[in-house]
């Protein structure tokens, strides 16, 4: 039978700290402490609404039954009743003598006759109550570790659920963008719209299936963990003999149990969207853009035809005028747009960093400033050779399947949108700024980036466009 000391400790765990009796209909509050239903209800009625143990606030409507504590109370009552009915303890099945010793080497409970046998006589022995207390403590340590691992597993389960929800939200947002893009391209592209939606939905099914499989594997691990925890709890509630039966094997299993690493899918969407014929449609809005030397940073060199820009090795001798950028290697297009639809393309071959887009005509030119839609810049950029971002606030990471050698920029002033296309990848849509607060004329924006020891010396080149169908 379990010794008196561990039983006393277990009774203390299920004692209500309000009435100081074993809990009746145990209820848990938000902080995790449990009390008799009647006791904690009285505390709430008196207007205290704070935990008697930790003084944290709680709400009566959030009380929840603690079945684990209720079961423990019932089991302890049964153990106590069994102890009263069997005062002489367990008897050895071989010698019919009282079992009161524990062989530490063999891990077996013995009577005094067994302890004197040739098999056990030279082994270290301790009283069974002492052994039970020792292994009770070891089981408690093992149980605490497993419960911690269970918490980690449950947190991972919650993370997977959140990723699934995130996937669904992103897919719905992407569907809307696809739909809007096809509407702009008129009804003759309706069939292509459906094809692209089917691709996206297939990606959704695949990713959710992957997350579902991961969730199922996690559920299996959680079930195995719960079964192991239940076995440890059952042993702790049983007699000393039941507790010690194969106890070393159980402890080894609990110590070796670890949550297996799971492959949780990324929530990043793959870029699957492009419209056949989009390049021809965009180029019907093509315009001839040239660079404005009056706005060029002194470290920039413009080509004679003002269609290329690169970073110089030395500062250029240029007038100090108000229009010129003085801190960053930037330059604006000479053209201004305050209505209509316009489109141009820029060659970025060999570049490891660049910024492209449009900005208000009156943006700040001097000193340091942020490049985002709040400050009048609607741009995307590449930095560190592979990091694409949109200049939102905060920045939006962009995931391109094919690195672009040519970027298309489409401005629809009346629709308040600026769209960017990867011409290298079937003119697939990279990003669209919507509901832009233009508030005045806009100008094309260019930044070839810093040279970075010669690795980013290639120029930005405005591409000639063949307009029409």
Curated annotation (Swiss-Prot):
**Gene encoding it?**
TRIM21
Keyword ATP-binding attributed: no
Q: Where are the zinc fingers (B box-type)?
A: 87-128
Residues the entry annotates as binding Zn(2+): 92, 95, 114, 120
Task: Describe the reaction catalysed, as an equation.
Answer: S-ubiquitinyl-[E2 ubiquitin-conjugating enzyme]-L-cysteine + [acceptor protein]-L-lysine = [E2 ubiquitin-conjugating enzyme]-L-cysteine + N(6)-ubiquitinyl-[acceptor protein]-L-lysine
GO CC entries: autophagosome; cytoplasm; cytoplasmic stress granule; cytoplasmic vesicle; nucleoplasm; nucleus; P-body; ribonucleoprotein complex
Q: Say which enzyme class the record assigns.
A: transferase
User: Can you say what this protein is called?
Assistant: E3 ubiquitin-protein ligase TRIM21
């Amino acid at each position: 039978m379990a010794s008196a000391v561990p039983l006393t400790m277990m009774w203390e765990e299920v004692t209500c700290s309000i009435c100081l009796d074993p809990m009746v209909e145990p209820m848990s509050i938000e902080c995790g402490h449990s009390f008799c239903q009647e006791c904690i209800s009285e505390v709430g009625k008196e207007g205290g609404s704070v935990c008697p143990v930790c003084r944290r606030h709680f709400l009566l409507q959030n009380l929840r039954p603690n079945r684990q504590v209720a079961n423990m109370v019932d089991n302890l009552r049964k153990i106590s009743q069994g102890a009263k009915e069997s005062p002489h303890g367990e008897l050895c099945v071989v010698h019919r003598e009282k079992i009161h010793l524990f062989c530490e080497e063999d891990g077996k409970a013995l009577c005094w006759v067994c302890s004197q046998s040739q098999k056990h006589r030279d082994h270290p022995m301790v009283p069974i109550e002492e052994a039970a207390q020792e292994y009770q403590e070891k089981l408690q340590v093992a149980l605490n570790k497993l419960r911690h691992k269970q918490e980690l597993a449950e947190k991972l389960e919650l993370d997977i659920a959140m990723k699934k929800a995130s996937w669904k939200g992103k897919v719905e947002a992407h569907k809307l963008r696809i739909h809007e893009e096809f509407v702009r391209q008129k009804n003759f592209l309706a069939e292509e719209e459906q094809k692209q939606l089917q691709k996206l939905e297939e990606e959704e099914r695949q990713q959710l299936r992957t997350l579902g499989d991961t969730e199922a594997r996690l559920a299996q691990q959680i079930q195995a963990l719960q079964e192991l925890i239940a076995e440890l709890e059952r042993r702790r509630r049983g007699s000393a003999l039941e507790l010690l039966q194969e106890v070393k094997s159980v402890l080894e299993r609990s110590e070796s149990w670890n949550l297996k690493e799971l492959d949780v899918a990324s929530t990043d969407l793959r870029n699957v969207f492009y419209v056949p014929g989009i390049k021809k449609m965009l180029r019907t809005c093509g315009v001839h853009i040239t660079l404005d030397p009056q706005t060029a940073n002194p470290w920039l060199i413009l080509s004679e035809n003002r269609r290329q820009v690169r970073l110089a090795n030395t500062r250029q001798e240029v007038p100090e005028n108000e229009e010129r950028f003085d801190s960053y290697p930037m330059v604006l297009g000479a053209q201004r747009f305050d209505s209509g639809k316009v489109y141009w393309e820029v060659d970025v071959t060999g570049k490891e960093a660049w910024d492209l887009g449009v900005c208000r005509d009156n943006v700040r030119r001097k000193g340091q400033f942020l490049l985002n839609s709040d400050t009048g810049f609607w741009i995307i950029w590449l930095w560190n050779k592979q990091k694409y971002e949109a200049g939102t606030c905060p920045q939006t990471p962009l995931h391109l399947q094919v690195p672009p050698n040519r970027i298309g920029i489409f401005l629809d002033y009346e629709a308040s949108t600026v769209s960017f296309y990867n011409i290298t990848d079937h003119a697939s849509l990279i990003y669209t700024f919507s509901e832009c607060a233009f508030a005045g004329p806009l100008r094309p924006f260019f930044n070839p980036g810093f040279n970075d020891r010669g690795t980013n010396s290639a120029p930005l080149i405005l591409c000639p466009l063949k307009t029409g169908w």
